[in-house]
Amino acid sequence: MKDILEQLEDRRAAARLGGGQKRIDAQHGRGKLTARERVDLLLDEGSFEEFDMFVTHRCTDFNMQDQKPAGDGVVTGWGTINGRVVYVFSQDFTVLGGSVSETHSKKICKIMDMAMQNGAPVIGINDSGGARIQEGVDSLAGYGEVFQRNIMASGVVPQISMIMGPCAGGAVYSPAMTDFIFMVKDSSYMFVTGPDVVKTVTNEQVSAEELGGATTHTRKSSVADAAFENDVEALAEVRRLVDFLPLNNREKPPVRPFFDDPDRIEPSLDTLVPDNPNTPYDMKELIHKLADEGDFYEIQEEFAKNIITGFIRLEGRTVGVVANQPLVLAGCLDIDSSRKAARFVRFCDAFEIPLLTLIDVPGFLPGTSQEYGGVIKHGAKLLYAYGEATVPMVTVITRKAYGGAYVVMSSKHLRADFNYAWPTAEVAVMGAKGATEIIHRGDLGDPEKIAQHTADYEERFANPFVASERGFVDEVIQPRSTRKRVARAFASLRNKSVQMPWKKHDNIPL
């Protein structure tokens, strides 16, 4: 028996060594952790239970029978994050470059199936050179099996992708279908075709970092939700994100201890909105002052900065936040901000996360680039996302709520439950100046008359009371009491239930 146990430990030690110490040292030399080190940092200490440690590939072409490392380049299993079960796979770049084989894919599919059966999130750590060319179509078939699991798990359990090395070719489509993608600066890359192919086909000279690095995907393409300085920071932030999320679509998000009085009054909010309606202010200040202990987890911070998305807690419960940012493009909606917010709203709705919308929006950004780029269809995505949402929704209008953008941003007309407005709110078709120039175009040559007409319009419409008179705003509240009012509103909506008409699926304007 002793010999058998020793043999088992020898096999385990060899499997844990991956591609060998030389390749582990090379991985560390690039500033990267190994697959197992990443899993250990991601999960609670000692909680990881590994599956299929000794699985090997079955390929015999190109002398592959002589290279059969245990585990086949991916570490899979389950563990806990703050005591809650998650399933994880971590590709091992030290083993055949982390390349994806048939059995490599089967290991990933196995834990994804288990995650769906048991209602737990899936976290994938990607660090792979791509398909294992020696296996040909078997490798591609493996990709397809993983893709199908991504699709079936979407909206059922949260899926999080961590890009911690190369992720190229067909491999990029699995992370692309997950809920969140995180990258590491200077060491992670995502692209369908690499720099060499780009140069051959288009004659463009571009580096891997420029083509598919963390900066590109967080600021330009919006493929990634955040980028971090190193592996350790990225893993810590994913642990933090998981703590905001439910395990699956049938559970509520976790309730965490809080020490911040939900009835806290914040007098500084009374002066947050400047007297001049054209002067910007930072909407994040309001978000931090509403949140328990001021804690805000922002999603896609570097992309479409004219809208803010992320998670806070109120009374220890997760709330998704969507807010216009007056500091950028005056808070206008455009193509990018509409796409960004729509995807976030749909995620929250899929996983029963209540939505708080903070509005200061003068309209949709005008211009040929927006119209040619399809702002109509992209703006409709956000409209559609809010209109189909059935989670508790609370809206606060802080200043401007003009035109179609007002309707799109979780208005009462889209079934928002509570719609509050500050006294500084202006709910109108458009700003006073633009409206006056249309209504009184015959007086445009008389500055005094135009000034008087503008003042009259402002007095009549540049306030929240017309909308309040019609029931489109539930109450005009004091800014200082916003946290209290919002917290009480969400507390009253915890048992909300909405019946939707039967449909096979919707047809959102993609």
UniProtKB/Swiss-Prot annotation:
Annotated phenotype, changing residue 79 to D: Loss of solubility
Domain CoA carboxyltransferase C-terminal residues, every copy: 261-504
Chain ranges of the CoA carboxyltransferase N-terminal domain: 1-257
Reaction catalysed by this enzyme: propanoyl-CoA + hydrogencarbonate + ATP = (S)-methylmalonyl-CoA + ADP + phosphate + H(+)
UniProt-annotated stretches for the region Carboxyltransferase: 1-504
Matching Pfam families: Carboxyl_trans
UniProt EC number: 6.4.1.3
GO molecular function terms listed in the Swiss-Prot or TrEMBL record: propionyl-CoA carboxylase activity
Pathway: Metabolic intermediate metabolism; propanoyl-CoA degradation; succinyl-CoA from propanoyl-CoA: step 1/3
Keywords: Ligase
Region feature (Acyl-CoA binding): 292-325
InterPro entries: AccD/PCCB, AcCoA_carboxyl_beta, ClpP/crotonase-like_dom_sf, COA_CT_C, COA_CT_N
Quaternary state and interactors: The holoenzyme is a dodecamer composed of 6 PccA/alpha subunits and 6 PccB/beta subunits.
Entry note about domains: The beta subunit contains the carboxyl transferase (CT) domain.
Function: This is one of the 2 subunits of the biotin-dependent propionyl-CoA carboxylase (PCC), the enzyme catalyzing the carboxylation of propionyl-CoA/propanoyl-CoA to D-methylmalonyl-CoA/(S)-methylmalonyl-CoA. Within the holoenzyme, the alpha subunit catalyzes the ATP-dependent carboxylation of the biotin carried by the biotin carboxyl carrier (BCC) domain, while the beta subunit then tranfers the carboxyl group from carboxylated biotin to propionyl-CoA.
UniProt similarity note: Belongs to the AccD/PCCB family.
Protein name: Propionyl-CoA carboxylase beta chain
Organism: Roseobacter denitrificans (strain ATCC 33942 / OCh 114)
Gene name per UniProt: pccB
